[in-house]
Amino acid sequence: MTKRQITDIDNLKFEPFDNYGVVVPGMSWHKISYSRENGGQGTYVLKMEAGAKSLLHEHTGFEEFFMLEGELTDPDGKVFKKGDFVSFKPGSQHSSHTKNGCLVLVFMRGINKPL
């Protein structure tokens, strides 16, 4: 099948995370099907190094993610850990940080707006 794509999660090629128009230190991604050109739809794997923090942003559409490795903490103190599936509704605002690093499978439906 020419329209099938298989991604080997153990052998990804990560690039600096620049989804907000600037490179965010300590964050990198491997785009699977995600594209800003198609309205921010698709999937990517996000890698955050120890001590990394995402920019404060608002979700214009749903964002869902599955924690593959490590832990991620939101400003309210909620910790997402390996095996957690998290959903953010449109209009939600947050930033996240990781103490020891993490790997996250992200499903996007809309472009996040930096705040």
Where are each of the predicted segments found?
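A short, N-terminal "cap"/entry segment at the start of jelly-roll beta-barrel domains
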Residues: 1-40
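Short beta-strand segments in beta-sandwich/barrel cores
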Residues: 53-54, 70-74, 85, 112
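Ligand-binding loop in jelly-roll beta-barrel domains
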Residues: 90-115
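Conserved short histidine dyad/triad with adjacent acidic residue
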Residues: 28-59, 89-93
